[in-house]
Structures are given as C-alpha cells and as structure tokens.
Amino acid sequence: MMLNSSTEDGIKRIQDDCPKAGRHNYIFVMIPTLYSIIFVVGIFGNSLAVIVIYFYMKLKTVASVFLLNLALADLCFLLTLPLWAVYTAMEYRWPFGNYLCKIASASVSFNLYASVFLLTCLSIDRYLAIVHPMKSRLRRTMLVAKVTCIIIWLLAGLASLPAIIHRNVFFIENTNITVCAFHYESQNSTLPIGLGLTKNILGFLFPFLIILTSYTLIWKALKKAYEIQKNKPRNDDIFKIIMAIVLFFFFSWVPHQIFTFLDVLIQLGVIHDCRIADIVDTAMPITICIAYFNNCLNPLFYGFLGKKFKKYFLQLLKYIPPKAKSHSNLSTKMSTLSYRPSDNVSSSSKKPVPCFEVE
C-alpha cells in the first residue's frame, strides 16, 4: 500500500508500506522470460492469423470479422509487452517515462476488455447460427458484425481511460526506485474499488455468464438433435470442444480476477498485512502471464477448429500465396459450427443432424 508524500520535479514522491512485497529474484528472471515467450509466440501466431483471415479467407463471414478483430487487439497489446519485460527485469524500475507508462497500461486494459467482449459476441453468434440459423439470418450480417466490433473497440477504449488518467510514474522514497503504478490520493476513495469491481464484473463475470449460457444452449440443441437421429453416430468431440471453450476462458481469467480484487483491498487499506501483500504482488504477474498468454492463443485456438483456417494457415507456412479468387467460408472463430437449415431441431427426425465441424 502506498501513501502520498510530496511532489518534486513533476514526479510524485510516495512511501511504500510494504517495500519488499513481490520483489523476488526469481520473479525478475521468470516473468521477463515468460513475457518474451508470449511476445514471440503471440506476434507470430496472431500475425499469421490476420494474414490467413484477411488475405486467404477474404473476410466473408461474421465469425471471421470477430476473429480478425481479436487478433488485432492481441497485436496491439503484444507491442507493449517488451516494455513490461524490461520493467520487471529491472526490478520494477520504469525507465520509459510517464507517457509510455500510461499507453502501455491502457493497452493491457484495452486488450482485456476487447478480447472478452469479442469472445462474448462470438458465443452469441454461434448460438444464433446453430440454434436459430434461419431466424437470425437478417441479424447475422457482415455490416452488423463490423458495427459491433467498432462498438466493442469504443467500449474497450472507454474502459481503459482510468489507466490513462490514474496510472503514472512515481518515485518511491523508501526504496529509491521509479515505478509505473496506480496511486490514489485518499485511502477512503471509492475509485479503486469501483475500478476493481468493474474489471471483475464487466471484464469477467457478465461475459462468462453469457458465454456459459450460450454454449450450454448450444450443447442442449446438439444433444437434442442427436437424440432425434439415433441411427446417426454421435460425435463426442463436439461436446468436448464446447466444454474446453468454457473452461479455457474460465481458468485463464479467474486467477487474475481474484488477485485483482485482493489488490484493490490492499490499496484501500482493508488488508494491512505485508505478507498477504507479498503473496498478491508475487502472484499478480504470474496470473497476467496465464491470462494474456491464453488470450493471445485464442485466434489460433478457435481458428484451428475449422478446416478452412487450418488449411490456409498451413499453406501460409509453406509460402503458398492465396488464390486471386477465394470461395472459402470461414465458419467460425470457434470455428466451423454449421447448422443445417432448420430452426427446430426436434421437428423432424428426417432432417440432418446439426454438425459442429472439427477438422
């Protein structure tokens, strides 16, 4: 917990009540290494995903629009990751100035909200495409998808404003280091608890409930369709993938959200124990690695479930250029979930079973 002291040379000077919290040699080695791995893998994977979706698949479906925007949001975040790697390797000494402190912090916040919102919209799109394919046709258009993505980027930018406003460079007098951190003028301020709860609720809880509901309804619809056509072999991979998508999202973000909430309690002075502060400050960068590494893999995780994406991705790796004219159908970001024309899965046993193509 930090307490305000004075201002000198434009940089606020503060005291740290728990100066040793989170400051361990293994953190200063492990975290920059993990950040570097995330940067290389993320830049490579997301850049290829953008090329495949835009140049090979020609951006023809709603799902491809969401997937492309997810990859672009990840790339925006990844470009700032070397700054955080250097910051941690220098034992939390920020050498890049106040401007980059704000931009890099806003990028982290922006990626969180943009990615989560895009995944939520994708789950709704998959629900409409599978459970209500005919009724949702007029709503599931490229124009609607693009407008939705613009709104998501605006909302994510709005949610990132607190990082630009309140994240600054501070000089900690009792440790003699300059840090890039959040600092609130009053311990009684409602601002930190408000920002923390916004991140917990808007950045995780509500999106998770929507994603869980969407895929649960998809699960039930597919299960019902299999029961109608009992003579058809059941593809259990479909249900495993639905379960994997939900669990992948949940376990990627839960640790980070929990420690974010604990960090808010420390900032407010509710938690005074430096031992707990040490646990939180030590665990926080690890949870960030888990959340954002999984986040940066999302375009590949979802894309590789589709035959078209996988095919063109491998072509790109072999330096095979895209054809001048493409008739490909990117079927999802979660990928090729297709539903054969019927909005009523139980209406007729003669109708084809809905299929979740996993290639």
Swiss-Prot record:
Angiotensin II binds at Q15, D17, R167, F182, H183, Y184, K199. One of its GO terms (biological process) is neutrophil chemotaxis. The chain crosses the membrane at residues 26-55, 62-89, 99-125, 142-165, 191-216, 240-268, 279-304. CDD domains: 7tmA_AT1R. Pfam families: 7tm_1. It is found in: Cell membrane. The keyword Isomerase does not apply. Interacts with MAS1. Interacts with ARRB1. Interacts with FLNA (via filamin repeat 21); increases PKA-mediated phosphorylation of FLNA. Belongs to the G-protein coupled receptor 1 family. This is Type-1 angiotensin II receptor. It comes from Oryctolagus cuniculus. The gene is AGTR1.
